[in-house]
Amino acid sequence: MAHKKGSGSTRNGRDSNSKRLGVKKYGGEQVTAGNILIRQRGTKVKPGQNVGKGKDDTLFALIDGFVLFEKSNQKQKTISVYSSKN
């Protein structure tokens, strides 16, 4: 007979790497064309003026300018880039 108890197995011990999602450039910040504005899963925020959307729903600036968050209706948020700050 064994004198030591066999160690039991566990079904835990896994975790996925974080995906670094979220807002990368905030309202009023200056951006250049191609800068990533938001990394997201699904369209929590929709692209507005001068903002493109990648296949993974990443929003990025199409022109140099300033970031502005807006509400297109009661619920939906959009992000736009304008060449002037006002």
UniProtKB/Swiss-Prot annotation:
Statement: the UniProt record of this protein carries the keyword Lyase: no
PROSITE patterns the UniProt entry points to: RIBOSOMAL_L27
Subcellular location: Plastid, Chloroplast
Alphabetical list of InterPro entries matching this protein: Ribosomal_bL27, Ribosomal_bL27_CS
Pfam families from the UniProt entry: Ribosomal_L27
SUPFAM superfamilies to which the protein is assigned, alphabetical: Ribosomal L27 protein-like
Keywords from the named record: Chloroplast, Plastid, Ribonucleoprotein, Ribosomal protein
Region of interest (Disordered), ranges: 1-27
Example of a GO biological process term: translation
Molecular-function annotations in GO: structural constituent of ribosome
One cellular component term from this protein's GO annotations in UniProt: cytosolic large ribosomal subunit
Protein family according to the UniProt entry: Belongs to the bacterial ribosomal protein bL27 family.
Protein name as it appears in the record: Large ribosomal subunit protein bL27c
Gene: rpl27
